[in-house]
Amino acid sequence: MKPQAILARILEQRETPYEEMVELMRAIMSGNVSPAMTAALMTGLRMKRESIGEITAAAQVMRELALHIEVADSVNLVDTCGTGGDGCNTFNISTASAFVAAAADAQVAKHGGRSVSSKAGSADVLEAIGIHLNQTPDQIAQSITEVGIGFMFAPNFHHAMKHAAPVRRELGVRTLFNILGPLTNPAGAKNQLLGVFNEDLTGILAQALLRLGSQHAMIVHGSDGLDEITISGPTKIAELKEGEIREYTVQPEDFGLERTAIESLQVNSTDDARVMLLSVLDNHPGPARDIVLLNAGAAIYVAGKADSWAEGVEIARDKLASGAAKEKMLALIKFSNQLTH
């Protein structure tokens, strides 16, 4: 397998066979492919559009090479990690949703990193509220079990990514690596709310997660480009549940929520993102809380803590109103800081 031959095939708009893609990803992850070639391959795949097989093969390799977290009871384990790269610069909706889901007794294995293309990544905002990021796999497993939520700082678990990280940073555009992060949860969460930057990826990633053994997942893309369930208009959903995939569209009005432009959710800095996150967890009414209700409700549903998405939204509303979601945030801050003393 020569990367040059694979690149030539990609430029002809042809798919890379599964085994060759596995071999290529292992070579990239071990530093045996030059930065220039890695950049060319990632750009070529993006222009061709990555296939289900290519994505699944690459995710399989990343899963093999990742540090793993063992959570004793993982039936209700859920991740709310999205691809990012939507260019919308909203506050950290999936991070806020993670605390609400944890308050609803879902076990949240939140996976994420620093910002690549947004104003604040999940790691940036969690650090800003006082959470210690550098925890061991055992400590995070304990956090998930005892607090109900743990945060896995992606660079600490995907050491093999160090070879591709400089290329990804320098390119500054969405590539296969944006897609892989949410498919490679170190705790092996089989339930996911996964936001994507492109509508076409909803069905593709549902198929990839099916092949990778997921249990219940919702892959979502807002009509405004948001890699979340949006409140500004329709959201395209591909839902994987017990081996079946169903595709449909929802509107905020379906859940009794008012349609609002996403400009009110945009931030210019990590501190802006922190302030908006805390405002939601303080249950301040408005578009930020509404969009978290939609997304947290979906996370609660896929985690098996609600029989329907609508019920999940009502549970989310209750957990914000009671202060339980904010308590989860405070508990995680306390737990993570105990580890450093």
Curated annotation (Swiss-Prot):
Gene3D superfamilies from the UniProt entry: Nucleoside phosphorylase/phosphoribosyltransferase catalytic domain, Transferase, Pyrimidine Nucleoside Phosphorylase, Chain C
Q: List the disulfide bonds.
A: none
Q: Name one GO cellular component term.
A: cytosol
Q: Which residues are noted in the entry as anthranilate 2-binding?
A: 168
A Pfam family (short name) is: Glycos_trans_3N
Q: Which GO terms describe its biological process?
A: L-tryptophan biosynthetic process
Q: Per the record's keyword annotation, is Metal-binding included, yes or no? A: yes
Provide the alphabetized UniProt keywords: Amino-acid biosynthesis, Aromatic amino acid biosynthesis, Glycosyltransferase, Magnesium, Metal-binding, Transferase, Tryptophan biosynthesis
Which cofactors?
Mg(2+)
Cross-referenced InterPro entries: Anthranilate_Pribosyl_Tfrase (IPR005940), Glycosyl_Trfase_fam3 (IPR000312), Glycosyl_Trfase_fam3_N_dom (IPR017459), Glycosyl_Trfase_fam3_N_dom_sf (IPR036320), Nuc_phospho_transferase (IPR035902)
The note describing how and how many cofactors are bound reads: Binds 2 magnesium ions per monomer.
Which pathway, metabolic or otherwise, does it act in?
Amino-acid biosynthesis; L-tryptophan biosynthesis; L-tryptophan from chorismate: step 2/5
Subunit note? Homodimer.
Q: Any idea what job this protein has?
A: Catalyzes the transfer of the phosphoribosyl group of 5-phosphorylribose-1-pyrophosphate (PRPP) to anthranilate to yield N-(5'-phosphoribosyl)-anthranilate (PRA).
The entry's family comment says: Belongs to the anthranilate phosphoribosyltransferase family.
State what protein this is by name: Anthranilate phosphoribosyltransferase
